[in-house]
UniProtKB/Swiss-Prot annotation:
<dbReference type="GO" id="GO:0009986">
    <property type="term" value="C:cell surface"/>
</dbReference>
<dbReference type="GO" id="GO:0020004">
    <property type="term" value="C:symbiont-containing vacuolar space"/>
</dbReference>
<keyword id="KW-0677">Repeat</keyword>
<feature type="disulfide bond">
    <location>
        <begin position="245"/>
        <end position="270"/>
    </location>
</feature>
<feature type="disulfide bond">
    <location>
        <begin position="25"/>
        <end position="42"/>
    </location>
</feature>
<feature type="glycosylation site" description="N-linked (GlcNAc...) asparagine">
    <location>
        <position position="205"/>
    </location>
</feature>
<feature type="disulfide bond">
    <location>
        <begin position="56"/>
        <end position="113"/>
    </location>
</feature>
<feature type="domain" description="6-Cys 1">
    <location>
        <begin position="21"/>
        <end position="133"/>
    </location>
</feature>
<keyword id="KW-0461">Malaria</keyword>
<feature type="disulfide bond">
    <location>
        <begin position="64"/>
        <end position="111"/>
    </location>
</feature>
<protein>
    <recommendedName>
        <fullName>Merozoite surface protein P41</fullName>
    </recommendedName>
</protein>
<keyword id="KW-0472">Membrane</keyword>
<keyword id="KW-1003">Cell membrane</keyword>
<dbReference type="InterPro" id="IPR051444">
    <property type="entry name" value="Parasite_Repro/Invasion_Surf"/>
</dbReference>
<feature type="disulfide bond">
    <location>
        <begin position="284"/>
        <end position="348"/>
    </location>
</feature>
<feature type="disulfide bond">
    <location>
        <begin position="297"/>
        <end position="346"/>
    </location>
</feature>
<keyword id="KW-0732">Signal</keyword>
Length: 378
């Protein structure tokens, strides 16, 4: 019975997110660090509503993703552009970009990563410190499982290691995505317990960062050379207008309900109906000092005029927001099962304290089309 339940969960999980995909370019990986090429590339072919994570020890030029390079030639003048100008409706949070659900034209852009010899040595040490020496490779695990000679204790051990590894990856991803703003240097969480001599390796050895010094990796004996990492992204277009409200911009028409905040009206309400499985959202008027209430919408929302944790109403939702800036849109992926109808709100507060714009979402009960189609027989 457990096996049937597990398979059903996996099936639903895979089909639930079939419309979006996560991409990552991680230039701290050994294949990039130990490459003998002066340029190393990571190419991403993305669609609207996908997310992209850019992990780089030392970013060059634009910090990605608040601004990105629109030319592969880093020396070209005026080659950077704000992500809101290039892909309106996208959200940047930490080292991750959630691509706008509506992209009008095919859009390429680039991010660059500086990998000098000292930085490379530092991250090789970090990678090797974090690697669990007694951890079996995925191939070894599958070999044991297929052989049928795995005891229950060994199976539990494999499962625990997999869960621990997943937790470590999840915690690290959360740390990267919760960063207040992208910076040139890559920060690492204290929870990894990386020794200070490794964390500060680049500080202690900065004088050795010279092209005339031959450096070899202490483990593989491969020569280490300085190089540039290039993340090349190609985002494909679509024709899906975003279901939601855009306060303060009635010209772009990226959202289904573009609303101008011009004039003397101090309070406007934009009402949207959302069904299970749908992605909905809103964007406040662009103001550097504007704010949203509750501050961590959609994790918290206004329900019956009270601040409420959304997970108590519709567990299983997903939100895409920048916790440190209200200039980006706020998106909510409604879960595929909703028990009952709920009406929730988030408010955009203007610099002028008298101005308030309300996003009101009427969440309908039931099951999503993905779930319903999963149980249909051909």
């Amino acid at each position: 019975m457990k096996g049937v339940i597990f398979c059903l969960v996996v099936l639903l999980w895979r089909q639930a997110w079939v419309s979006s995909k996560s991409h990552k370019c991680d230039f701290t990986k050994e294949k990039y660090l130990l490459s003998g090429e002066k340029e190393v590339s990571c190419e991403i072919d993305a669609n609207p509503s996908d997310d992209i994570t850019f992990i780089c020890p030392n970013k060059i030029d634009s910090l990605c993703f608040h601004t990105v390079n629109i030319s592969k030639n880093i020396n070209q003048n005026k080659s950077t552009m704000s992500i809101q100008d290039l892909l309106y409706g996208s959200v940047v949070y930490g080292n991750t970009l959630f691509i706008s659900p509506y992209v009008r034209t095919n859009t390429p852009f680039y991010c660059f990563c500086n990998l000098d010899t000292v930085t490379i040595q530092k991250f090789l040490k970090i990678n090797r410190f974090l690697k669990d020496d007694d951890e079996l490779s995925e191939a070894d695990v599958m070999k044991h499982l297929k052989g049928g000679n795995v005891s229950e204790a060994q199976a539990d051990e494999y499962l625990n290691k997999a869960l621990n590894r997943f937790k470590k990856m999840k915690d690290l991803s959360k740390f990267f995505n919760d960063q207040a703003d992208n910076t040139t240097k890559l920060n690492l969480p204290k929870s990894l317990n990386i020794p200070n001599d490794i964390l500060n390796y680049d500080v202690y050895n900065s004088s050795n960062n010279r092209n005339d010094i031959v450096v070899k990796d202490e483990v593989t004996n491969k020569q280490i050379i300085s190089k540039r990492g290039i993340m090349s992204v190609f985002v494909r277009s679509n024709n899906n207008v975003i279901k939601g409200c855009d306060f303060g911009n009635n010209n772009k028409n990226y959202f289904s309900h573009p609303i101008s905040v011009a004039g003397k009206v101090n309070n406007k309400v934009c009402k949207i109906q959302g069904k299970p499985g749908e992605l909905v959202g809103f964007k406040c008027a662009f103001e550097e000092n504007g704010k949203v209430e509750p501050p961590n919408c959609f994790d918290q929302v206004l329900h019956k005029n009270k601040v409420t944790d959304l997970k108590t109403l519709i567990p299983g939702y997903a939100s895409y927001t920048n916790k440190h800036s209200s200039k980006y849109p706020y998106y909510l992926k409604i879960p595929h099962f909703v028990n009952e109808q709920y009406t929730i709100q988030c408010k955009c507060k203007s610099n002028n304290s008298q101005n308030e714009y309300t996003f009101e979402l009427d969440i309908q009960p039931g099951e999503s089309e993905v779930v319903l189609n999963s149980f249909k027989t051909s």
